[in-house]
Amino acid sequence: MKKMLKVGQIVNTHGIKGELKVTSLSDYLERFEELEWVYIQGYDEKYYIGNIKYRPTTVILSFEGYDNINIVEQFKGKYVLIDESQRRELPEDTFYKADLIGLDGYTVEEVYLGKLVDIIQAGSNEVYVFRDKETNKDILIPAVKEFIPEISLEKKRITVDPIEGMIE
């Protein structure tokens, strides 16, 4: 099966003409304009994007052939997905969250921290959550260059340069 990426979550219907209110999971709100079609979690078919409207915190989407609220209500709560062929090319040193989850974290001194299990949005920065499988302890590291000097998808690892007291 293809690896799918979440680009939004359908939070509700909008009006009676089959429009859906979607919370974008992309840093690039206009992402949906680049897509001809998407998948919906739990369904195998492609859904071709009709209209796109922007609201302050959401995107209003409609799909071709889905012009009635009764048809689209089943999608509430589902994720809007794309396959890897639809990925945008990212700038250097920028990564998809889905590619980072599961990478091993090591300090610059080669001390194993655990696997990256979550990425939390905390204000203007993200925070990486590493979990040590043996102790089940979470270690939170701000995802800034000062503390994360290297990420290697090829080596499947993230290098952390913590300050004193950050990891204990």
Swiss-Prot record:
Limits of the PRC barrel domain: 92-166
A Pfam family this chain is assigned to: PRC_RimM
Alphabetized SUPFAM superfamilies for the sequence: PRC-barrel domain, Translation proteins
Keywords: Chaperone, Cytoplasm, Ribosome biogenesis, rRNA processing
Location(s), subcellular: Cytoplasm
Superkingdom assignment: Bacteria
Regions crossing the membrane: none
One Gene Ontology term, aspect cellular component: cytoplasm
The UniProt record lists the keyword Chaperone: yes
GO biological process: ribosomal small subunit biogenesis; rRNA processing
GO MF terms held by the record: ribosome binding
Record note on quaternary structure: Binds ribosomal protein uS19.
Functional summary from the UniProt entry: An accessory protein needed during the final step in the assembly of 30S ribosomal subunit, possibly for assembly of the head region. Essential for efficient processing of 16S rRNA. May be needed both before and after RbfA during the maturation of 16S rRNA. It has affinity for free ribosomal 30S subunits but not for 70S ribosomes.
Similarity remark: Belongs to the RimM family.
Domain comment in the entry: The PRC barrel domain binds ribosomal protein uS19.
Protein name according to UniProt: Ribosome maturation factor RimM
UniProt gene name: rimM
